Amino acid sequence: MKKLLPLAVLAALSSVHVASAQAADVSAAVGATGQSGMTYRLGLSWDWDKSWWQTSTGRLTGYWDAGYTYWEGGDEGAGKHSLSFAPVFVYEFAGDSIKPFIEAGIGVAAFSGTRVGDQNLGSSLNFEDRIGAGLKFANGQSVGVRAIHYSNAGLKQPNDGIESYSLFYKIPI
């Protein structure tokens, strides 16, 4: 069953209908946890196609992000999977061919177990908090770094939480 989860995720992501007015992106990320484990993430995002506080310095925008992460490492919680969904706010600084940006978001994530790496999350359903920074190029591609924290916000004990620190690459589709 657990080996079928990545295939089910890819099938679900490929069957999502994206409105023609919204831009979609695919991302890949490789990261490490604070406990020496590795993470591998595939994501699909949809631009909100809205801007706020647009000035000569930059603008605030955002996107919806859906992701699948494979968690490797740890004695008791190796080989776990998670699905996540989050709204992400992005402040994009002004620029011609390269636009630096910072991002932050809070969403939800469902894990294939309560132990991930050497951490006990206490619950399979957790919150996802993220911050990141990167560069967006004129062709729509982006590269950056991201820190994501997962925990159940104290709704169930134990609540060790776990982090993923990653490098990502995003391309428009």
UniProtKB/Swiss-Prot annotation:
Leading EC class: hydrolase
Database matches in InterPro entries: Lipid-A_deacylase-rel, OMP/PagP_b-brl
Membrane topology, Extracellular segments: 50-56, 90, 99-100, 129-138
Result for mutant: residue 149 to A/N: No deacylation of LPS
Catalytic activity reported: a 3-(acyloxy)acyl derivative of bacterial toxin + H2O = a 3-hydroxyacyl derivative of bacterial toxin + a fatty acid + H(+)
UniProt GO BP: lipid A metabolic process; lipopolysaccharide metabolic process
Main localization category: membrane
Membrane-topology descriptor: Multi-pass membrane protein
Listed transmembrane segments: 29-32, 34-49, 57-71, 74-89, 91-93, 96-98, 101-115, 118-128, 139-148
Site feature (Critical for activity) residues: 152
Record keywords, A-Z: Cell outer membrane, Hydrolase, Membrane, Pharmaceutical, Signal, Transmembrane, Transmembrane beta strand
One example GO MF annotation: acyloxyacyl hydrolase activity
Signal peptide: 1-23
Catalytic residues of the enzyme: 149, 151, 163
Topological region Periplasmic: 25-28, 33, 72-73, 94-95, 116-117, 149-173
GO cellular component, as recorded: cell outer membrane; membrane
EC number: 3.1.1.77
Pfam family, one: PagL
Activity regulation: Decreased activity at low temperatures (15 or 21 degrees Celsius).
Gene inactivation effect: Has similar growth characteristics to wild-type in LB medium at different temperatures (25, 30 or 37 degrees Celsius) or in LB medium supplemented with 0-4 M sodium chloride, 0-1,500 ug/ml chloramphenicol, 0-5% ethanol or 0-1% chloroform. Only when chloramphenicol is present in the medium is a difference in the ability to grow observed. The difference is most pronounced at a concentration of 650 ug/ml chloramphenicol, where the absorbance of the wild-type culture after overnight growth is 1.7-fold higher than that of the pagL disruption mutant.
Consequence the record notes for mutating residue 81 to A/N: Does not affect LPS deacylation activity
Function: Has lipid A 3-O-deacylase activity. Hydrolyzes the ester bond at the 3 position of lipid A, a bioactive component of lipopolysaccharide (LPS), thereby releasing the primary fatty acyl moiety. Lacks fatty acyl chain-length specificity as removes both 3-OH C10 and 3-OH C14 fatty acids from lipid A.
Assembly and interaction partners: Homodimer.
Protein name as catalogued: Lipid A deacylase PagL
Organism: Pseudomonas aeruginosa (strain ATCC 15692 / DSM 22644 / CIP 104116 / JCM 14847 / LMG 12228 / 1C / PRS 101 / PAO1)
Taxonomic path: Bacteria, Pseudomonadati, Pseudomonadota, Gammaproteobacteria, Pseudomonadales
